[in-house]
């Protein structure tokens, strides 16, 4: 949720943010109206309760002559208080709905526009000089690494098996990511992948993208370990006196991909289940932008270790999720597509998620304040696409990046004999 003080003092900032996202600025006025109505209802109910309390007190000392009128007034006040409390509850519900409808306020400098209006910040490495490259699925099947056919037989479309050294390649990649995280003071974590609705909602994943989320009974399957790690410290006051608190969560992730019909249907680029190591940071809001750059730096270090060409983009406001105030993506070159494909994203969510989840820290004066939260991918299944396609050789084998050789057990992936 956004900062109500900012809304009340400078609503134009929020309106401009809504416009830059391509969202309705009228939602800001609806929230202001709901806020005014809620506060008025609270004040009215409080005044009536105070009068009711005073009247009840007067009854004890009232004379026989005054008592009937006071009793009548007490009865009338009881009805008024009941009605006022109903109004208070209704205005509170309307306010909560209006409040949840507003996305995070976009930071200054974020490109305006939609999906294709990103700004390219850096390009690293050159596409490999491949003639007639094979795609990752053709390579994966020929080398005994990926089995989509049996994945579909067992679970349906967009499911797969990673087999043999394909499994080792992913496990090695994620272990490498976790090792990098630990070297940089992240606390490793294997979180639950089923979460309560209030945690999923608190992270902003039950808004426009609710159709992407699987539900099992009264719990939700996470599409990223960002969700349980954001909920980990809900309703807590953190000690950030020694600096940001960093976690690295390794989990399976689940997505319906409801909005991607017909897109990336071949192979493992866009699937219903995958594995990921996600970095998550709690910090003071004043440290958030610096921490965002650190997360991006660690992502770039991981990409350097797997030796693939990539670019960094500053995602446009209209392509941001509701929780993100700014997001950087690292996109690797995919030879068979002749284009870049997202491998990582890192988002600065400022205080938006933490305000919903009531996560705070104590400032220098000891006063509780809302923390900032950030997240960033450190490794995921999709990275295998870039590794296989960029490191393929003319004979159909694939060179294993040296950083992954100790995990995979070979320098070259070749057809099984």
From Swiss-Prot:
List of residues binding L-serine: 224-226, 278, 377
Top-level division of the source organism's lineage: Bacteria
Enzyme class name: ligase
Pathway in which the depicted protein is active: Aminoacyl-tRNA biosynthesis; selenocysteinyl-tRNA(Sec) biosynthesis; L-seryl-tRNA(Sec) from L-serine and tRNA(Sec): step 1/1
Compartments where found: Cytoplasm
Family matches, as InterPro entries: aa-tRNA-synt_IIb (IPR002314), aa-tRNA-synth_II (IPR006195), aa-tRNA-synth_II/BPL/LPL (IPR045864), Ser-tRNA-ligase_type_1 (IPR002317), Ser-tRNA-synth_1_N (IPR015866), SerRS_1_N_sf (IPR042103), tRNA-bd_arm (IPR010978)
HAMAP family associated with the record: Ser_tRNA_synth_type1
Assembly description: Homodimer. The tRNA molecule binds across the dimer.
UniProt similarity note: Belongs to the class-II aminoacyl-tRNA synthetase family. Type-1 seryl-tRNA synthetase subfamily.
The record's note on its domains: Consists of two distinct domains, a catalytic core and a N-terminal extension that is involved in tRNA binding.
Name of the protein this chain belongs to: Serine--tRNA ligase
Species assigned in the record: Mycobacterium leprae (strain TN)
